[in-house]
């Protein structure tokens, strides 16, 4: 979080203070009063707002990628809104973790279900900034349609779909974004957009 605290960007949560005690750590950060993107998707997002949010998230990713930080857990619940409709990226806790863990209860309920994971992340392979771009593509699809592009009954089935299933087609009303979506959701990192800065160029 130290690097994040040094970043001054409108689409990244502002961190005012960091501290570590003998048995605890504390973070004082900006109060975000507009709810999260997960809630907003459930309510329904206009095409105009979906594109605006996409640009803002891409701008935040470009900023953190530029200083060598990967988010690794990009999902609607980690994207907050302010009252003025601006986006703030939060929860960089996974940025320091080298391994992704999925926990499962005795009943088989999955925590951290990999709806937003890139194929390489889902398979436990090395990731770079292009993995975050893939996750953003999943979120963009969900903002435009209200549905996740890949759904299944188990984590492994979702991971398989990310790696093998065709990229779903957007509804006709928003089909003009299909080319961008294809470039974000390409299975191989080298076939994707190579930088978050490229996103606005496709809009």
For each feature predicted by the language model, list its residue ranges.
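Protein kinase catalytic-loop region centered on the HRD/HxD motif
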Residues: 59-69
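Conserved short submotifs of the Hanks-type protein kinase catalytic core
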Residues: 22-36, 40
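Flexible N-lobe loop architecture of eukaryotic-like protein kinase catalytic domains
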Residues: 8-11, 110
């Amino acid at each position: 979080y130290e690097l994040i605290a040094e970043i001054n960007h409108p689409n990244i949560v502002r961190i005012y203070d960091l501290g570590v005690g003998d048995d605890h750590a504390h973070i004082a950060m900006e109060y975000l009063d507009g709810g999260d993107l997960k809630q907003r998707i459930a309510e329904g997002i206009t095409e105009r707002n979906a594109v605006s949010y996409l640009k803002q998230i891409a701008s935040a990713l470009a900023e953190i990628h530029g200083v060598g930080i990967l988010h690794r857990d990009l999902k609607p619940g980690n994207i907050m809104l302010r009252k003025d409709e601006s986006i703030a990226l939060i929860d960089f806790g996974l940025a320091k973790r080298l391994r992704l863990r999925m926990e499962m209860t005795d009943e088989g309920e999955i925590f951290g279900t990999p709806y937003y994971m890139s194929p390489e992340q889902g398979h436990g392979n090395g990731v770079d900034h292009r993995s975050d771009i893939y996750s953003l593509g999943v979120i963009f699809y969900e903002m435009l349609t209200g549905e996740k592009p890949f759904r299944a009954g188990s984590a492994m089935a979702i991971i398989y779909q990310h790696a093998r299933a065709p990229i779903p087609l957007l509804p006709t009303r928003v089909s003009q974004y299909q080319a961008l979506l294809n470039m974000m959701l390409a299975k191989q990192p080298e076939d994707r957009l190579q930088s978050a800065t490229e996103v606005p160029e496709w809009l």
